[in-house]
């Protein structure tokens, strides 16, 4: 659909010949919104004044909108990502002059000057040159000078200096992200000579040779994968082949901060087509570096020498277990979703749920494996390796890490509960309720991850076995809602702790927490029970907790 949209826009839009120093091409015309037109008019007026004042020395001030905005406008999509590249000064210098101009000409534009926020260099966050940010007509606009980059073998942080438009375009991750919009000419500029065609064809290609591009900054691999997933584009076969180069894996580990990996992966996992991205990750054999369990080499080394589960964890990584599991999940996921309209609906409503479910499903080979989270602690220092992958490897939130780890490490116990549920006589309502409370409201993630794990273990041709599996899980899911267990984590004892201690003629102490759990258990099996009936039950079992 997106590709046909591109063709339509690029073929039917008013076209004109655009000339650059080295080549001529036909470029589509971008239609600006009213606000965008106001911004461009202001920038044009200020640029004209500046060039008149300085007589175009050393060269005329020229402004270009860069990157994602140009791509998205050509795709017919709205974009609020407005980055302006400047050729003869820094972003801060330009923004300061523009603000002074606005103060003098407020009546003409009706736009208030805003404070300029300077974003300093921060290479670890991929900010290699300082950027100035301000608001124009209610839109945040970033100003930065055109730049060129030179990399070393040991770092993804380049030496950055002022550059030409060609140099700035060639340093970008993809040709279709290297398109510029010349504000003064109202034209799209394609200094890579391939960006417009690649955008029309839906192809992601690096402006420079792919291997060196990826070795310079391996994050570009993940960015291309994300763009392929977001727009349903293909990656050029030669570029795809270089993604799988073992050298890229090594560079990925040594050059990229886990925070940057996490930012890209979170965008992928909450996006519209995460499966395509996972397929590309699996084909490039990047799963081991993307889903690695820690970013601190000293912690990794300590675990290699002292962790009991390390051989099993390394087996998952080194013997292709994770890659094979990921491949199976990708192949069978469409069939899995087709059978579960409830899951499709839930994923459609909640991108966060989609992220946590997918991570739980693909990390299931790590179930119940632990690492030493803090080598300095002598006791209680074991952490689920799944939790570490999510929290330290992907740098997602503590809550997401806890939910995913609990889900993965409970897959076997969830399957055991389902096996008992198949024979209702073996399972009390309280046993189900107490089990579900362990997930603190996130039991549905565990439910579908457990079903996914069981589903992947059944050969595709054993259709009767598959149907029986889904039937059992669907019946269990319905049972939970029919018996009001879906929010069972919110259930509290009908007698509060203070009153309970008084009625049991006991002083509050450690016993009270255990008795509270027994009260909850009793309430699951006796939903219409009274306070007095509960106290009578608790008196009978109290001695074993003292």
From Swiss-Prot:
It catalyses: a tRNA precursor + 2 CTP + ATP = a tRNA with a 3' CCA end + 3 diphosphate. The keyword Repressor does not apply. Pfam families: PolyA_pol, PolyA_pol_RNAbd. Keywords: ATP-binding, Cytoplasm, Mitochondrion, Nucleotide-binding, Nucleotidyltransferase, Nucleus, RNA-binding, Transferase, Transit peptide. CDD domains: NT_ClassII-CCAase (cd05398). GO terms for molecular function: ATP binding; ATP:3'-cytidine-cytidine-tRNA adenylyltransferase activity; CC tRNA cytidylyltransferase activity; CCA tRNA nucleotidyltransferase activity; RNA binding. Its EC number is 2.7.7.72. GO terms for cellular component: mitochondrial matrix; mitochondrion; nucleus. InterPro entries: NT_sf, PolA_pol_head_dom, PolyA_RNA-bd. One of its GO terms (biological process) is tRNA 3'-terminal CCA addition. Present with 13500 molecules/cell in log phase SD medium. Belongs to the tRNA nucleotidyltransferase/poly(A) polymerase family. Nucleotidyltransferase that catalyzes the addition and repair of the essential 3'-terminal CCA sequence in tRNAs, which is necessary for the attachment of amino acids to the 3' terminus of tRNA molecules, using CTP and ATP as substrates. tRNA 3'-terminal CCA addition is required both for tRNA processing and repair. Also involved in tRNA surveillance by mediating tandem CCA addition to generate a CCACCA at the 3' terminus of unstable tRNAs. While stable tRNAs receive only 3'-terminal CCA, unstable tRNAs are marked with CCACCA and rapidly degraded. This is CCA tRNA nucleotidyltransferase, mitochondrial. The gene is CCA1.
């Amino acid at each position: 659909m997106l590709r046909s949209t591109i063709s339509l826009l690029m073929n039917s839009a008013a076209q004109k010949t655009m000339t650059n120093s080295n080549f001529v091409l036909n470029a589509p015309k971008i239609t600006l919104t009213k606000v965008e037109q106001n911004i461009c008019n202001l920038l044009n007026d200020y640029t004209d004044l500046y060039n008149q004042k300085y007589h175009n020395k050393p060269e005329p001030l020229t402004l270009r909108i860069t990157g994602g905005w140009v791509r998205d406008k050509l795709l017919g999509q709205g974009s609020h990502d407005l980055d302006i590249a400047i050729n003869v000064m820094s972003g801060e210098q330009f923004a300061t002059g523009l603000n002074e101009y606005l103060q003098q000409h407020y009546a003409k534009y009706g736009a208030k000057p805003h404070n300029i926020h300077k974003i300093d260099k921060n290479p670890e966050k991929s900010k290699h040159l300082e950027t100035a940010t301000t608001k124009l007509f209610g839109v945040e606009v970033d100003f930065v000078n055109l730049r060129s980059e030179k990399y070393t073998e040991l770092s993804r942080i380049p030496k950055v200096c002022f550059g030409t438009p060609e140099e700035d375009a060639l340093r970008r991750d993809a040709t279709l992200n290297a398109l510029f919009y010349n504000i003064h000419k109202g034209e799209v500029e394609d200094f890579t000579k391939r960006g417009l065609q690649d955008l029309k064809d839906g192809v992601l290609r690096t402006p420079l040779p792919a291997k060196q591009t990826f070795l310079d900054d391996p994050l570009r691999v993940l960015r291309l994968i994300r763009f392929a997933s977001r727009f349903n584009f293909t990656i050029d076969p030669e570029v795809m082949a270089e993604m799988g180069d073992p050298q890229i894996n090594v560079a990925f580990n040594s050059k990229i901060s886990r925070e940057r990996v996490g930012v890209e992966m979170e965008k992928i996992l909450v996006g519209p087509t995460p499966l395509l991205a996972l397929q590309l990750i699996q084909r490039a054999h990047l799963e081991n570096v993307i889903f690695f369990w820690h970013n601190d080499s000293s912690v990794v080394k300590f675990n290699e020498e002292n962790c009991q589960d390390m051989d099993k964890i390394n087996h998952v990584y080194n013997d292709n277990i994770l890659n094979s599991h990921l491949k199976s999940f990708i192949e069978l996921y469409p069939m899995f979703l087709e059978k579960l309209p409830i899951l499709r609906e839930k994923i459609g409503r909640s991108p966060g749920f989609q992220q946590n479910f997918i991570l739980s499903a693909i990390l299931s080979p790590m179930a119940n494996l632990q690492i030493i989270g803090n080598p300095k602690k002598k006791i209680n220092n074991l952490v689920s390796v799944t939790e570490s992958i999510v929290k330290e490897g992907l740098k997602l939130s503590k809550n997401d890490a806890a939910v995913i780890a609990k889900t993965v490490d409970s897959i076997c116990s969830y399957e055991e509960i389902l096996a008992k549920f198949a024979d209702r006589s073996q399972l009390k309502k309280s046993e189900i309720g107490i089990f579900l409370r362990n997930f603190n409201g996130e039991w549905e993630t565990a439910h579908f991850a457990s079903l996914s794990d069981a589903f992947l273990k059944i050969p595709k041709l054993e259709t009767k076995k598959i149907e029986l599996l889904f039937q059992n899980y669907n019946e269990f899911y319905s049972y939970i809602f029919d018996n009001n267990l879906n929010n069972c984590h919110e259930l509290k004892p009908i007698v509060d702790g203070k009153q309970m201690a008084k009625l049991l003629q006991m002083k509050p102490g450690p016993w009270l927490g255990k008795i509270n759990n027994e009260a909850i258990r009793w309430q699951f099996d006796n939903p219409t029970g009274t306070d007095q009936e509960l106290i009578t039950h608790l008196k009978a079992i109290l001695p074993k907790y003292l």
